[in-house]
């Protein structure tokens, strides 16, 4: 079963070489006329299409894919790693020398991790168990919330609630035993957990840099911060958030294969971390310097052609992909790979704002939005309208869509193994993605929903006439209210035309006036994550889901004990419970997990806190001479680049 999950996740990341036979005009120069570009291990430049915003510390202030790439490049020595062959999380063999799992009398599970004593930050400072404990304690500190960040809520840790509520001085679920031994206790109520050791996902952070004067201590009852009075919002504003030197944007002491040496004007520069001992497979980086920049889709092919960029990562859009493929046809020195996205682009409704607090209005928008045309305009043949809140590359979709079939047992397998396989296939066969409401475009259905919700008048208070009226109105205690909505999307998005023209026009057919505005990402995401005041009714953005897919983390508990989706305001205990049921699936029970995942997708479609727009295929373009760039065995280019090199 573990092997099957590994197969599915590897398939989701699988990169297949692509080629295209494209017509060439007589005026086009022959490939031999192109200037010769020399590549070396001295330096490369990677171009991405999502701007870097400087969230290089954690995802607490945002989680754009480009910022995540930087974090994967400079923060290393995670306690665990995803093993693509076994399909499970395992201790990172470069970090953990020994692991012991014990069942306690309370049925809690204690995991003792012994760390190697040769781990260092990029400045040579030793890394100990205290650095991991500090990472946990800092990211769950209420001071983070004062600074506009999303506080981590590791509810799986024993003693979490007592510690976070201030009724306990120490976090008893994390203990120290010397400099290189860490004991983590998982609450029994949080088990089973489908991704098992994925709960131990943790990288070290230097307390001496982020919180000078603060130390991690353990008097036998669990870890706590000594001199915690020094961990104030004012202190962290300087050490974390200072625009010129704060650890959030300029982390100088880090643990990954590369260290950040410069970040300015949206461009980041990295050099090899000389103290990096290597990953679990012994890989150490060869390429000395990396520059990471953001370019618009129409700039990508030219930059690769003239050699100013070495790798184009996650290219989307019909024109950009076509230009890249044509370039690989013209120049044999260049190649490309494609892989299905493990996420999607979507519209997030702020369901606690009028009129989107009305389910009927959200459903009406779903029926009105011409998502097929939007996907076609933006992606052409390289994407499709999203069928739910998932990506084409997620293993759950691949399994239920039949794109991946579980491997049959060997002929010499036992009768029990064959029976288990048959049962599993029967369970999977009963699951159907078509159970998710597709919201195929239907103006008539949308109009009925709007009228039922009271939006049936015109600006004069008379019955709305679609032949002559444009905007619907509703009678409220404050008078007539127009059905006018606002939507913000990131500047430079390839979907700008689809949003400003196609979406606006399709909603107008139902009597909804939509005003669309492009805003900088450093304005959009703080609003989306509700770190700043929400100014729009809807946000258009994209996401790629992590390997540890635990949507229960999307929710927070309200003061009256209900559960609210943090980014869109939807209060839905049933949806939250479905996410809890998902994570508590027994490890290896793929059919059981997919069953709960499908119910979760159906609930999202029913309540419409988000409207899935499209998912797509990504393309990477890079020199043929770049050896070892094995994306299929990795999750992102920073992980693949560690083993990549140019033969010299």
What are these regions (language model features)?
Residues 47-106:
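N-terminal lobe/hinge region of extracytoplasmic solute-binding protein
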Residues 190, 198-285, 289, 443-452:
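Gly/Pro-rich hinge or "lid" segments in bacterial periplasmic/extracellular proteins
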Residues 244-249, 266, 275-324, 513:
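Ligand-site clamp/hinge motif
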Residues 149-234, 404-416:
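Surface-exposed binding/hinge segments that line
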Residues 267, 368-423, 447, 495-504, ...:
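Detector for C-terminal structural segments
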Residues 264-265, 425-428, 433-443, 454-542:
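Ligand/substrate-recognition segments at binding pockets and active sites
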Residues 97-152, 177, 183, 355-357, ...:
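Aromatic- and charge-enriched surface segment that lines or borders ligand/interaction sites
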Residues 45, 128-135, 179-183, 257, ...:
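Alpha-helical secondary-structure segments
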